[in-house]
Amino acid sequence: MNVDSLDVFFNPKNVAVVGASNNPLKFGYQIVKNLLDLKFEGKIYPVNPKYDNIQGLKAYKSILEIPEDTIDIVTIIVPNIAVPSIMVDCAKKGVKGVVITSSGFKETGFEGRKLEEEVVKIAKEAGIRVVGPNTTGTLNMSNGFTTTFTVVPERKKGPLSFIAQTGLFLSLIHIS
């Protein structure tokens, strides 16, 4: 793997947020809010079949309804059982990268491990790069792109990008 293969996680032209929400108590709300607050310049596509609009943006019932030919990156924050079918949709749509924030995979035992193996198989067959599952996501302060569900304090833009498997590291960056 080279650094260029990670570019989609930091410099996408568009992002779909599966599990986006208008409910401030949901992680999917905070991901969209962070993208808006950080003034991400790419297109943001909230995906949730329960909504027509999310935080002022048109919402889509599924990834397949998004009018782009390809989607650079999808961040997934839905119950673990739904992730494999979303990954199949990502493969059909030509998604380049996926950040799976959802938990409940191999860290929970046999059933979770089976789910994770299914996700990995789909990703490998489709050539999709994956960060996660059970991750706090990515953050690029220079262009306002993030997939994290944690509150991102306002910061001066600069040449820093961050990818973390554990929230502790990203949280330490936030409070420093």
Map each language-model feature to its residues.
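Rossmann-fold NAD(P) dinucleotide-binding segment
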Residues: I63-E68, I81-S103
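Rossmann-fold NAD(P)-binding glycine/threonine-rich loop
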Residues: G104-A126
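Glycine-rich adenosine-cofactor-binding loop
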Residues: K13-I31, S161-T166
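A short, basic/flexible loop-to-alpha-helix module at the beginning of a structural domain
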Residues: M1-F9, G144-P153
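Conserved small/polar residues in nucleotide/adenosyl-binding loops
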Residues: I173-S176
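N-terminal Rossmann-like NAD(P) cofactor-binding module of classical short-chain dehydrogenase/reductase
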Residues: T75
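NAD(P)-binding Rossmann-fold cofactor-contacting core
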Residues: L25, N34-I54
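General beta-strand structural signal in soluble alpha/beta enzymes
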Residues: Y45-V47, V98-I100, K124, R129-N134, ...
